[in-house]
Amino acid sequence: MARSQVRDERKKQILKALDECLQEKSFEKTSIKDIARVASVNHGVLHYYFKSKDDILLQYIDYVVDDFKRQVQEILFDSGMEKLSRKNLLKEIFAFVNQKLVLDKRLNRTFIEIWEISLYNKAVRAKLKFAYQEWINVFDMNFKKGIKDTDNSYILSILTVAFWEGMSLFSTIFEKRELDFQQVLDRFLQKILKDL
């Protein structure tokens, strides 16, 4: 394995370890040694790959965002997807986002922690703003291709991302028996498809 591949794999191992740690306790209470222990590496290794604990968090955000962008690109460029109508393609994308992001309690728990950190950490806030702006722009571009009212596609994109974030928060607070998440998500998609 090439040195750069080993480096990338080791960094990914450490980022996944941070995710594991954040399932158990807050970022503030998580130490470099905790992350190293979960990653099964000496804590000195973390300092080789990352400048600080905050740097691990910032790179973790990039890692998650890049992974989901890659998965969305795979959906968009899947050989069968190009034959789908705009509405059916949006249904596929929404189904993916709903399952992989909105209803993923583990990921939501981690990002709630990151949102809290962003209140006090400008670098984390900037990283989140950038990530959300990218999501909004991707949906704006896709909505413009199929929506009748292109002047409002950007607003619709913001509403969609904000709705998903709200549902993500709800999915960590409410149990499935208390709130029918799938029904709410399906109705939201129906409303969007009506405008296409």
Feature locations, PLM:
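Helix-turn-helix
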Residues: 13, 21-59
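Short, basic, alpha-helical segments at the C-terminal edge of helix-turn-helix-like DNA-binding modules
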Residues: 32, 62-69
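Residues in soluble alpha-helical coiled-coils and helical-bundle/repeat scaffolds
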Residues: 51-55, 80-84, 98, 102, ...
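Short alpha-helical scaffolding segments that buttress acidic/His motifs in well-ordered protein cores
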Residues: 93, 97, 111-115, 160, ...
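Hydrophobic/aromatic-rich alpha-helical bundle segments in the mid-to-C-terminal region
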Residues: 125-129, 145-196
